[in-house]
């Protein structure tokens, strides 16, 4: 395992609160603190702080995000900070997933249906390969990393070591490749495939987009090279390397037979149990389905729904937690939980939802009881595997604060911008008062966010302001995700001035142009008017030098009081810091390009007749999670062009695919 130090490449040094936050977090980890919290206000550069902490500690790090989009954004940022180190992306590889389910009321069985994205699967394999081979690894993952992922020891044991000069019989090597689930295809080489041409073996590894070419002289390996899959050009010659399995789930032949025996024993016991309850139909169904699966396992080593037998295939005891991505990490690793107030509850919720569905399948004879052990980790199992953790949030949850032995605040923004000034005004005449405030902002070409409690009120308010000549739009639940992003971009670009919505808390609302946030009915207690929600909403104006928040209310609730006190406390600290250091707040300059809109633009060009030309800027703007579907689109068009003998057009598609793949795996 190599041990290259982490080295940050950034055009700026830590400023404001960042140096003290970095120093405290690093000292806390070195002192053995198991849990710490970085309580960082919006726009204070929390990702940069965490990157500096990772650099100082030099530990393999898992960064956990609560959705794919945030994971992609974090991965992009960290790759820009650490171009010399391995920054990997690990999310669910399903483009579409319908889990197996049974609805007793209508006697409806829904078979599992899924579509696996090959590009994301490659990135998952790349992450585990990096964890085996080096220590300078950062894996940015979604919550899917707490699901089972084979057995690391078996995966590593199954890897095939190759070395120049070593005596290796080619036929034996081909058998080994088949054992670790590579398939021979002498026509079309790709991920998880190999081909032989004379004394040359070419392998498409599961974990990267380069081809491995192994050249033999008799039974001796003469050369090992990485070659370009499109041009065949040699990219790198190496002395030795490991070929890792094409799938994370690797089961040796002896364990497979033992698993079949254990499955048969469990089947007999469960059939007897169902018959004792007079569930004859369920017993017959279970026996028929399981015996078919057993025959498939014995003949081909695989069956549909094989994951439901994972407990037996892995040799685990009943109730024992499955191995997951965390088990691939070497010792002395670090966990960073981003937006912990959202991510930590996700960890708690995954197990319960999974078990409710499985129980119905087991009770009605569709699955053996052991299928319940094909599951995500329970929260207590997850935290038992965690050695040291840093929670990151502007509004950390009560649990994170309770378990943290150190809470490090990061309040000062590098730009000197302070938290918004807060005003509380009565609800009587609130609409006319708000209209006057909106007019002031429109005259200064600034933007306004307004949050209401109901969709109806948002619609009525929008109509009222439109009649009075205000350029206004509103967001609601029926607007899909892409339209929502387009509306937000239009607000930033000045196509309209006021955005009204019910819940404007969702991640991604980074709007430096917004100078006023108005919260109507702020004294109506509930989720949307809770302390953390109010702080998050007020924070939407925290990126503007003239940021203000107006809370319309007739009473001062406890949530309002706490949110106002916290915002004013931060504001006082920020103002004092600026005065002491002679800092004049500078407006945040942020380009309005959006990764998802860049993806849409490319998609539209893909559907045009000519082959798209992707500029470097367009590639840079694309989000990682949006690249795999683009590659699939281009591959389909490339194959269609080749079948029509339009080889020049197919070659241009091929070149674009290569550029997208390079961007995906982090190559410049």
UniProtKB/Swiss-Prot annotation:
Which SMART domains does this chain map to? DEXDc, HELICc
- UniProt domain UVR: residue ranges: 628-663
Q: Which GO terms describe its cellular component?
A: cytoplasm; excinuclease repair complex
Task: Give start and end of each Helicase ATP-binding domain.
Answer: 27-413
Q: What is its main location?
A: cytoplasm
Q: Which domain of life is it from?
A: Bacteria
Its family remark reads: Belongs to the UvrB family.
- Spell out the subunit comment: Forms a heterotetramer with UvrA during the search for lesions. Interacts with UvrC in an incision complex.
Task: Provide the protein name.
Answer: UvrABC system protein B
Species this protein is from: Thermosynechococcus vestitus (strain NIES-2133 / IAM M-273 / BP-1)
